[in-house]
From Swiss-Prot:
Tissue: Expressed in skin glands.
Record bears the keyword Secreted: yes
Sections of the chain in a coiled coil: none
Name listed for the protein in its UniProt record: Septenin 1e
Family from the record: Belongs to the Frog skin active peptide (FSAP) family. Septenin subfamily.
Location within or outside the cell: Secreted
Domain of life of the organism encoding this protein: Eukaryota
The protein's role, per its UniProt record: May act as an antimicrobial peptide.
Keywords: Secreted
GO cellular component: extracellular region
Record keyword Secreted present: yes
Amino acid sequence: TDAVANGVHAISGVVDT
């Protein structure tokens, strides 16, 4: 699932940092 960080969606399977 996509995680949301800094107001930007992460790519599927990748978590935003």
